[in-house]
Swiss-Prot record:
It comes from Theobroma cacao (Cacao). SUPFAM superfamilies: S-adenosyl-L-methionine-dependent methyltransferases. GO terms for biological process: methylation. Belongs to the methyltransferase superfamily. Type-7 methyltransferase family. Its EC number is 2.1.1.-. The record marks Y150, L222 as: Involved in substrate discrimination. This is Probable methyltransferase TCM_000336. InterPro entries: MeTrfase_7, MeTrfase_capping, SAM-dependent_MTases_sf. Its cofactor is Mg(2+). Mg(2+) binds at N174, D260, Y262. One of its GO terms (molecular function) is S-adenosylmethionine-dependent methyltransferase activity. Keywords: Magnesium, Metal-binding, Methyltransferase, Transferase. Binds 1 Mg(2+) ion per subunit.
Amino acid sequence: MDVEKVFHMTGGVGKTSYAQNSSLQKKASDMVKHITMETIEELYYSIAPKSLGIADLGCSSGPNSLSLIKDIVEVVEETSHKLFHPLPEFRVYLNDLPTNDFNSVFKSLPDFYRDLKKDRNEGGPAIFIAGYPGSFYGRLFPNNCLHFIYSSYSLHWLSKVPPALYDEHGKSTNKGNVYISESSPPSVSQAYWNQFQEDFSLFLKSRSVEVVTGGRMVLILLGRIGQDHVDRGNSFFWEILSRSLAISVSQGQIDREKLDSYEVHFYAPSTNEIEDEVGREGSFEVDRLEMFEIDREAKDGESYGTAVAMTVRAIQESMICNHFGDGIDLDTLFNNYGKMVDEEMAKQN
């Protein structure tokens, strides 16, 4: 499966869209907002460019990316005022895979510009926003054109499903699982780690050419607390997806062979792995590396399991539909998913 041609968050603004089911991602970015804004302030103090180049890598199609830009503009406005500098122009590049619903982002731009002009006597800052489709696992931008790179909830997605998961006959060595689980052989976690190393190293190398000397990056991604790949965090939610798909197999909606060959292109690194890989690649230095845990929450009248199921559906629907075809009932699949999450949570209470 060609991830770059298939993978995308569910577009539009419907009930199952990413725009309606990305509150978890918004909460994560809000939790580290102070770090992002401090980084922007430090950057402007040290460089104070007349034209500030900003890239949001993995912007997706929800409202989160434009809210980030608004926050950045406000911090730069305040900082430039303190320094008695004229406000720079802002060059904003919104990047995601070509399959992303960029139109939803573009349709929200008039409201974004209108909000920025409110309470500003001079009509607002000069902001030039462009969509930049393509994989960030490789070069995207000209040399030395960016000052700040931001990526939230994207770098845990690999460029592809690790090829080493399959034997010489093309059969998965991780049958019945969509990710690393307790029943996975050691070669599975090694395959995922090797793919993450390859991808993350290429990401860092590519960005090092595109960002100016003294530029900054803030990267937010899912990770794991310890060295064990199987925990009650990310691997747990993929385990629930494996079990939900197994129910679809038992109901005759999909073939067992299809389930056995489905693997997610995902990896949750530990902080040690990130730090080691940044040091090994050598282009950047880690200034700050922290782990945050997000509290469970759900919308009013909705169970936690349902909230998680809707989030997973919004990020996995494109891949599931492409792999399993039209025969799979997504509503039933994710209803089962939500129920199982609630059952597991009840056992912990």
